[in-house]
Amino acid sequence: MENRYAVHPEQVKRFTTEELRRHFHIPTLFVSGELKLYYSHEDRVVIGGVMPSAEPLKLDAGDFLRTEYFLERREIGIVNVGGQGTVTVDGEAFVLEHKDFLYIGLGHEDVQFASASGEEAKFYLVSATAHQAYPTQKAAIAELTPNHLGEASASNVRNLYQVIHANGIQSCQLMMGITQLETNNTWNTMPAHIHDRRMEVYLYLDIEEDARVFHFMGEPSETRHLVLANEEAVISPAWSIHSGSGTANYSFIWAMAGENYTFKDMDFVPMDQLR
């Protein structure tokens, strides 16, 4: 498990591109036959990728969490961004197709990931600390109704799926969903906003090999950018905007954790305040 400490915004003002990427960019999540985990001190979330090959892979706390098992004091949201796969939770199997979600609550000891025959599954996961056990629940993307947002004139027509949240799958603090931009649309989360009571992490998806997303971060008066390729993630502290524009349309999985469980608790930044 790779450790990522929190960083003060005053320090970020002086970061080079390499330093920005080292602290906030997650370049490698999916390696065949491996479980990759990153521990962020921003609200103590764990971000990870699981790509089972011939044998199943078990979610293990390792030495870093200092617990008997991974979900002893945590909850987790999982999205399959690869081929069909199965997540088995204390003996109960959940089959996840491409972009299906699964929430697993506090206290489950044995979580295993497996790929079906054919294309390997890629399980993206975000875990937050938890104080109460909520039921394990699956959400199939084909059965969800998105919110249609944006305008063609602003190049931001998109479909927002809220999955783990106060009015959907219940959790302690974790919120999670996916946003898919339509063809010829490139902007996400613009006008930008911040939410000082929650951190957020984006996983960018559906990006062609020769395309990129320019992810904007930083305080509104001190913005910076990171250039991201397909299946790369970025950590967004509570003080930072989190917006992006691609060379073509794309999707991104968003996940939030922190003090406030209200999705609409955010402060929009007027365009004339961005620098």
Swiss-Prot record:
Family matches, as InterPro entries: KduI, KduI/IolB_isomerase, KduI_N, RmlC-like_jellyroll, RmlC_Cupin_sf
Pfam families: KduI (PF04962)
Name of the gene: kduI
HAMAP family, A to Z: KduI (MF_00687)
Residues holding Zn(2+): 193, 195, 200, 242
Taxonomic lineage from the root: Bacteria, Bacillati, Bacillota, Bacilli, Bacillales
Similarity-based family: Belongs to the KduI family.
Stated name of the protein: 4-deoxy-L-threo-5-hexosulose-uronate ketol-isomerase
Alphabetized SUPFAM superfamilies for the sequence: RmlC-like cupins
Co-factor binding details: Binds 1 zinc ion per subunit.
